[in-house]
Design a protein with these regions (language model features):
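A penicillin-recognizing enzyme superfamily signal
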Residues: 1-21, 26, 73, 139-306, ...
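Proline/serine/threonine-rich low-complexity "mucin-like" segments in extracytoplasmic/periplasmic regions
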Residues: 295-356
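Short active-site loop at a secondary-structure junction
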Residues: 9-29, 41-47, 69, 132-133
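Conserved catalytic neighborhood of penicillin-recognizing serine enzymes
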Residues: 39-95, 130-133, 158, 170-202
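Mid-domain, small-residue-enriched loop/turn segments at the edges of structured enzyme/sensor domains
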Residues: 56-63, 91-147, 163
Length: 356
């Protein structure tokens, strides 16, 4: 874990305490609920450049109209307007609760029974159940995202992260030891987690996260970029190791503009490159274990190279605020190799039961 430059000058851990918006790293939790409700990644949806719902205006990055495409391809290309439609279908409050079961947030807005964060409520991560949550309006920490994405790598079993395994004295005697939970908790059915891994692999292999590809090793992940380039994320994983990267300034209004010569830092640029450089070393001596193919597709495999061609941009039918976080691919530029937030995943637990 890399939580800051110098603990002596500032006792603040950016990995565990910096609460910022998720950007499009929130989209996979909508997809997880979509799969949990019995829908297919091969379901077709229109991807207009602009979508207005109850006066709220949602747009794709670059005003791109993707035409009709599958949910799998919409995830790979991070299509905002399709994900707003998915959120309408599966409902924001259910997505917020499902994301919390995966390890996101300490509070659900309006939920008086939510677990309390030890920090003051005004500084606790909050997932507000609104349509914009599908595009990343929820508050998260970098460690929470690593923990939550690790649930899919672990085939649906969530493990609560901990930093200290055990404490030994000078003679090697155990003074304290984390009790752990080797079996974890099944929060999404195993077959749905396998499908999540397939879709998020396509996002790396042929989508917005392609800068994170590792030679000869399967990688799944998702990019995230918030409005006006104030936050950029990449969360990715192999079958047994997950790493979460966040870039941003202390001032949440300061933009990641002009960094390393980029007009704007997106999740697919520096965060994905940092992830790649770190994970290339971190996985070098680890077994190369592929993901388990999803059985639930019945032989239908997601085609990561097929998309519907863009069509003409539809005209909006009514005015509304323009505030969706942008999601975009980005050009590759060399980036620094900083140690991000990494979790080592335990082996899968017992056979899955119905997801919680």
């Amino acid at each position: 874990m890399y939580g800051g430059r110098n603990f002596k000058t500032r006792q603040f851990n950016y990995a565990t305490n910096s609460i910022r918006q998720a950007g499009s790293t929130m989209k996979p939790f909508v997809l997880a609920q979509f799969l949990n409700d019995g829908y297919s990644i091969n379901s077709p949806y229109p991807g207009p450049a602009e979508l207005i719902v109850n006066g709220e205006d949602f747009k794709n990055y670059g005003d791109t109209n993707y035409g009709q495409m599958t949910v799998g391809d919409a995830t790979r290309l991070s299509v905002n307007t399709i994900y707003v439609q998915l959120m309408q279908l599966v409902k924001p409050d259910r997505v917020a609760k499902f994301a919390k079961a995966h390890g996101l947030a300490a509070e659900l807005a309006g939920d008086a029974t939510a677990d309390k964060d030890p920090r003051p409520l005004e500084s606790a991560p909050v997932l507000k159940p609104v349509l914009a949550l599908s595009l990343g309006s929820g508050d998260v920490t970098t460690l929470q995202l690593a923990s939550a994405f690790g649930t899919w790598a672990n085939r649906g079993i969530h493990q609560t992260p901990h930093l200290v395994e055990k404490v030994l004295d000078a003679k090697g005697r155990v003074l304290e030891e984390h009790p752990g939970n080797p079996q974890g908790r099944q929060v999404i059915a195993q077959q749905h987690a396998d499908t999540m891994n397939l879709v998020l692999r396509s996002a790396v292999e042929n989508g917005t996260g392609n800068a994170a590809r590792l030679y000869g090793r399967e990688v799944a992940g998702k990019t995230g970029t918030t409005s006006d380039y104030t936050d950029a994320r990449f969360v990715g994983y192999t079958s047994d190791l997950v790493t979460s990267v966040w870039l941003g300034f202390d001032n949440p209004k300061k933009k990641l503009v002009g960094v390393r010569g980029l007009a704007g830092v997106s999740g697919g640029s520096l965060p994905a490159q940092i992830w790649h450089d770190y994970m290339d070393l971190a996985t070098r001596d680890r077994p190369n274990k592929p993901f388990v193919p999803p059985a639930e597709l019945g032989g239908v495999v997601l085609n990561p190279t097929t998309t519907a061609p863009p069509t003409t941009v539809p005209q909006p039918t009514q005015p509304g605020p323009q505030n969706p976080p942008p999601t975009q691919p980005a050009p590759t530029q060399p980036g620094p190799s900083l140690p991000p937030t990494t979790l080592t995943l335990p082996g899968p637990g017992p056979d899955p039961t119905n997801p919680a």
